[in-house]
Amino acid sequence: MVTYVVLAVTFNLPFLMEAHHFSSGNSGLMISLFFLAIMAPGFMLDNIVKLLGNKTKLYSLLAVAVGLLLIWISPTEWLIVPGCILVGLGYGIIQPLIYDKTVDTAIPQKTTLALAFVMVMNYLAILLSPFITDFFQWIFHTGSQEFPFIFNLCITILTMYWAYAKKGDFLFDD
């Protein structure tokens, strides 16, 4: 789910920037910053988890939500930059935790299989993202370039609520 939500940056940002008459050439730079931000938390992930504790996933989702919001409401193309960075940082923190929780949950003999399923889900999100977005645009009768960011922001907010409500459960206990 998180993979699907953040894919709006890579799949839809150039179209949003073009619709707002921004330089679509700068979208490549912004997408590069997004991927750089995904990588960056890996250098200090243990410290981040120690600092944020059982609210790590909640704060990661908050970063994604604020980033999507900044991208959506941006009156200038350079306000999109912190949005891309926040989405990337949030994803860069939560994605390794998903793999870690998968290893903790699986029985030792099935760890590789469990990780393979997580990877399959990520690749399915990448494959299906455009179709899911198009389907919901059709349902809501909109062709807006902002729609993927608004829709994914709503999904992220609902997931944040779930993460907050269940922060003491095994799934969210880091």
Residue ranges and their predicted role:
Residues 93-106:
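Intracellular juxtamembrane helix-capping segments at the cytosolic ends
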Residues 55-70:
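Structural signature of the two symmetry-related core transmembrane helices
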Residues 133-155:
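A membrane-interface helix-boundary motif in multi-pass transporters
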Residues 1-32:
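Extracytoplasmic gate region of multi-pass secondary transporters
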Residues 147-174:
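Multi-pass alpha-helical transporter architecture, strongest
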Residues 103-141:
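A late C-terminal transmembrane helix in Major Facilitator Superfamily
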Residues 40-53, 137:
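Helix-to-loop junctions at the C-terminal end of transmembrane segments
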Residues 3, 76-88:
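Helical-face signature of the major facilitator-like transporter fold
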